[in-house]
A protein has these predicted regions:
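Charged, glycine-rich active-site and insertion segments that engage polyanionic ligands
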Residues: 1-70, 85-88, 156-251
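Short loop/turn elements that form and flank the Walker-type P-loop nucleotide-binding site
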Residues: 45-46, 92-94, 124-127, 154-157
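Cys/His-enriched microdomains
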Residues: 62, 78-81
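ATP/adenylate-binding site constellation spanning eukaryotic-like Ser/Thr protein kinases
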Residues: 94, 112, 144, 167, ...
Length: 251
């Protein structure tokens, strides 16, 4: 898994506004108003490490891209979401944006080492170099330790964004080095599909009895990455509903 950046494409091809803005759609949802306000305050002096927890996989990545645009948009009220920098970031083509993508698998130590060779360079533009470790809980132990070594050295102009379901799923030493911003939790009232409902029922039975789950999931191809994310999201929705009732209202 290589570090994803496309400098040539960023220079030679500018995506349409509609293509790029689609990447910001989840971040622009009214549910994330509080999150955008918090990130706006941090932008003047951004932390080197920012953990984005809560929300869904898509929401976390969208907010990370929005924050990258906020840090690099040259307009008076950033992010404008229509200048070349914002459009390139929305399409993941920006020259100072690097994505280590753990959404479909683990982030390997080789990828982090490749990144470290880049970090010694100054940003190519006037803003910040932004490194997004998408689903940072996918960092292997060796990769996480290699990242920690990079964080030991002050790197002006570089911001690491670590989207993850919960901060507890990251190494404590990583969490201790950064700020944490919590996205709005997934809405609890979205109905499940019949297929997902079967998995929800099976998981509930397993929690109650300790039986059946491993038989259901151990078959080859029984659970792919997309299904696993939907199951986790369903659990998060249920958790949000319980917490909302406990606190007498919505979160």
């Amino acid at each position: 898994m290589a570090v994803k950046t496309t400098k040539t494409a960023a220079e030679d091809h500018l995506p349409t506004r509609e293509e790029a803005e689609a990447a910001f759609a989840f971040a622009l949802d009214a549910r994330q108003d509080r999150v955008r306000a918090a990130l706006d305050k941090l932008a003047a002096d951004p932390p080197q490490v920012l953990i984005l927890e809560g929300g869904s996989v898509e929401e976390r990545f969208s907010v990370a891209l929005w924050h990258a645009a906020r840090l690099n948009c040259p307009e008076a009220q950033p992010p404008c979401l229509h200048c070349p920098s914002c459009l390139q970031i929305g399409a993941s083509l920006f020259q100072d944006l690097y994505v280590l993508d753990g959404r479909e698998g683990s982030i390997k130590i080789e990828t982090v080492r490749e990144l470290r060779t880049i970090l010694g360079e100054a940003p190519r533009g006037d803003g910040k170099r932004v490194v997004i470790l998408a689903e940072a809980q996918s960092l292997g132990v060796e990769a996480a330790n290699a990242l920690l070594k990079s964080l030991e050295e002050p790197r002006p102009g570089v911001c690491f964004l670590l989207p993850a379901p919960q901060r507890e799923r990251l190494l404590p030493t990583l969490v201790s080095r950064g700020w944490v911003v919590t996205l709005a939790w997934p809405e609890a009232d979205t109905p499940s599909t019949p297929e997902l409902r079967q998995w929800e029922d099976a998981l509930a039975d397993f929690i109650g009895s300790g039986q059946g789950w491993f038989d259901r999931t151990s078959g080859k191809g029984a659970v792919d990455a997309a299904l696993a994310r939907r199951i986790v999201l369903s659990v998060q929705k249920a958790q949000a509903a319980v917490l909302a009732r406990r606190h007498g209202g919505s979160l």
